[in-house]
Each structure stands twice: as C-alpha cells, then as structure tokens.
Amino acid sequence: MLRTVLLGKIHRATVTGACLEYVGSISVDSRLLAAAGILPHEQVHVVNLNNGARLVTYAIEASEGSGAVVLNGAAARLAAAGDQVIVLAYGQGTAVELEHHQPQVVYVDAQNRIVSVHRSVEHAG
C-alpha cells in the first residue's frame, strides 16, 4: 500500500503578487523551490494563513533570488500581496520506502529569503 507524506514545505512565505490573467499556477523563486525539493510543474497545495483558503495548483519557477511568490489564474482570487502562505508538496511511497523519510522544510523571512532549511517538521507546543 502506498502512503502519502509531506516531501517539501516552504513555511510562511509572503505573497508578492497575484496575476489573474495568467494561465494558472504559483510562481515561486527557484531558490525556494530547490531548497524545499519541489520540482517545476509539481503539484503543490497552498494554504493562505490570512484567510484560510486552501488550493491545489502546480509550481513554476520565478527568477532565482527574486523572492517572488505569485498566485496566478483563478488562484489569484484567493490571496493578495502581503498574505502569508505555506506551500506544500506531497509524495507517495511504501512503508519501507518511507521508514526514514523526513520532509525538507524551508523557513523564510518577510522578503522570502531563506532563513533555515530543516529535514523535519518542528511542532509547536
């Protein structure tokens, strides 16, 4: 049986724009995608911490070092510049394949610069 687990996460990124007329997706600074292990065109879930919206789309690369996090197409209706979002990518594997799996979690500052990268999820509490 395959199980679905978190592969990579960009935590509390700041939305830098929304482009309703674009065909779709979320554009993310390629440096952030690479750090989280998220591939271009990979399915991602986006959670908006400001309004609670959740959506599924795919990631595309924005210019490296730009700090860009832009929701495109219909998703642009679910976020505004300045909102904080979490970008999550999931994968599947067997229990054996996942026995030692740890997700890549990227923490960023208000300008979407990488603060730290961890191979586990820290729990609040």
Swiss-Prot record:
Is synthesized initially as an inactive proenzyme, which is activated by self-cleavage at a specific serine bond to produce a beta-subunit with a hydroxyl group at its C-terminus and an alpha-subunit with a pyruvoyl group at its N-terminus. The active site is at 25 (schiff-base intermediate with substrate), 58 (proton donor). Its cofactor is pyruvate. The modification Pyruvic acid (Ser) is found at residue 25. InterPro entries: Asp_de-COase-like_dom_sf, Asp_decarbox. Heterooctamer of four alpha and four beta subunits. Catalyzes the pyruvoyl-dependent decarboxylation of aspartate to produce beta-alanine. GO terms for molecular function: aspartate 1-decarboxylase activity. PANTHER family: ASPARTATE 1-DECARBOXYLASE. Pathway: Cofactor biosynthesis; (R)-pantothenate biosynthesis; beta-alanine from L-aspartate: step 1/1. Coiled coil: none annotated. This is Aspartate 1-decarboxylase 2. It is an enzyme of class 4 (lyase). One of its GO terms (biological process) is pantothenate biosynthetic process. It is found in: Cytoplasm. Belongs to the PanD family. Pfam families: Asp_decarbox (PF02261). It comes from Gloeobacter violaceus (strain ATCC 29082 / PCC 7421). It comes from the Bacteria. Its main location: cytoplasm. It catalyses: L-aspartate + H(+) = beta-alanine + CO2. GO terms for cellular component: cytosol. Substrate binds at residues 57, 73-75.
